[in-house]
Amino acid sequence: MGSIQNSITGALGAAAGAAVAIKHTKDSDFSKMNSADNSAIISRNQARAATAEANEATNEAKKDGGLISQLSEAEVTEGEAKKAFEKAANRKNGSPITILNKMTELKAAKKAADTLRDKYKAVEDLQARATEQRRYAAKATQIALDEKTKYEKRWGGIR
């Protein structure tokens, strides 16, 4: 009798252990699904924020008198300063003071244009970051959908 009772007790223990293991597995799968979903939500929010920031910077740059027009003017000024310097440097009997002044003007124009180029590069970087965030958000959303589908197939729906 003892051995039958031990067998039954062992079988019940194994069944209870299996039930607990199944519950833990289901909970783990549910947790994975929720984590993926939360990551997707966060990614989408970050993508929206990055897109808004990039759009704002781009719109500001495109305004009249904005970064794009300033950069265009600075590049024209830089080109004119370069021509004036070269003309002064190539003159016969050119005054060293005139050459020095033209070189100073050229350096100032170049520095102004470089500063504006750096600002424009920052706007382009914001746009690239927003694009990358949108791409990442799309991947995270797909992963979340895949996890949800796996959970529903394995466990017959969401609790």
Where in the sequence are the language-model features?
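Extended amphipathic alpha-helical heptad-repeat regions
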Residues: 5-159
